[in-house]
Amino acid sequence: MATFTDAEIDELFETSGTVIDSIITAQGKPVETVGRSAIPRGKTKALSSAWEKHGSVQSPASQDTPDRQDRSDKQLSTPEQVTPHDSPPATSTDQPPTQAADEAGDTQLKTGASNSLLSMLDKLSNKSSNAKKGPWSSPQEGHHQRPTQQQGSQPSRGNSQERPQNQVKAAPGSQGTDANIAYHGQWEESQLSAGATHHALRSGQSQDNTPAPVDHVQLPVDFVQAMMSMMEAISQRVSKVDYQLDLVLKQTSSIPMMRSEIQQLKTSVAVMEANLGMMKILDPGCANVSSLSDLRAVARSHPVLVSGPGDPSPYVTQGGEMALNKLSQPVQHPSELIKPAMVSGPDIGVEKDTVRALIMSRPMHPSSSAKLLSKLDAAGSIEEIRKIKRLALNG
């Protein structure tokens, strides 16, 4: 029997406490995701070597327990013993390995190890086996597995030849248990983890992937309806803007036509301005005015009224009388108010002066204007003067 130092014993106590806490917390969890081992890294090798050393000591004691295990198989097969792995009757089946550990305690005390440490390790192995098969096995499968697991909780190199016979007896009708027990190396390694990792159905994904619980799945977006209504409102606004844009395009399509019409109007106004510039409004009383500039110069000269009483002496006659015209203006000579009787009829001289001014203002050839002026001088009647006037206008 190998001896344990104080440091190794403290390390085993610490590891067993961690494993027990992991078992307690892992029993209530559903088998949904693959968890991680609660044992720190680097502890597995030390634990496996400790279990092998402990199992090699208890191998003589385990040979005396086949009859007890057969009796426990019969007791567990009864309906009264079909209970979960954490119920009180299940603890009674865990006592034979403990008693075997107590019997082997005297031998271990000689080498320096404590009996309490070995009994606690046995209890820990029993609890780990119960925790592993509890969540996923049925009651019958649990009863078939307990004797095998109790005996398998003491792995050793010496009793490896006795395992196939006990395994065949312990699991007569459970194929799932046979599949787990057939691989001795995997079953022993899983027991060394002390139940921190539950057995679950193998899935396609690897264990390194991060699990995604259903509770953390994001809920469907609740504002999709608001977004859809907003998009519908935006589409309606866009259609309205498109319709208004069509109306604007229809209105602006007439702008080129309006521009062409405005240009035509400008051209017409320019022609009219040219024609108006060529036309002369002649004053019959001022026939000597032959141009528009002369007419404007005459229009600038206007009489100026001097207010005030003034000096009436020049307008008073010797008899003390003053002669006034139609505008009540004083006249120096009263004879100016008396006009001689005039012969009725048009004045030929005025007509000749008017036609002569018209001929001089017209843009004609000098020879043509000279010919018309000679005819005007020779005219002796109103009819001849009017003919010369028409010739000058048609010019």
Swiss-Prot record:
Residues 34-104, 126-179, 192-214 are annotated as: Disordered. Residues 89-98, 147-178 have a biased composition (Polar residues). The N-terminus consists of a long intrinsically disordered tail. The central part contains the coiled-coil multimerization domain (PMD). Forms a four-stranded coiled coil structure. The C-terminus constitutes the alpha-helical domain that binds to the nucleocapsid (N-RNA complex). This is Phosphoprotein. Residues 65-74 have a biased composition (Basic and acidic residues). Residues 222-285 are annotated as: Multimerization. Homotetramer. Interacts (via multimerization domain) with polymerase L; this interaction forms the polymerase L-P complex. Interacts (via N-terminus) with N0 (via Ncore); this interaction allows P to chaperon N0 to avoid N polymerization before encapsidation. Interacts (via C-terminus) with N-RNA template; this interaction positions the polymerase on the template for both transcription and replication. It comes from the Viruses. Keywords: Phosphoprotein, Viral RNA replication. Essential cofactor of the RNA polymerase L that plays a central role in the transcription and replication by forming the polymerase complex with RNA polymerase L and recruiting L to the genomic N-RNA template for RNA synthesis. Also plays a central role in the encapsidation of nascent RNA chains by forming the encapsidation complex with the nucleocapsid protein N (N-P complex). Acts as a chaperone for newly synthesized free N protein, so-called N0, allowing encapsidation of nascent RNA chains during replication. Pfam families: Paramyx_P_V_C, Soyouz_module. Belongs to the rubulavirus/avulavirus P protein family.
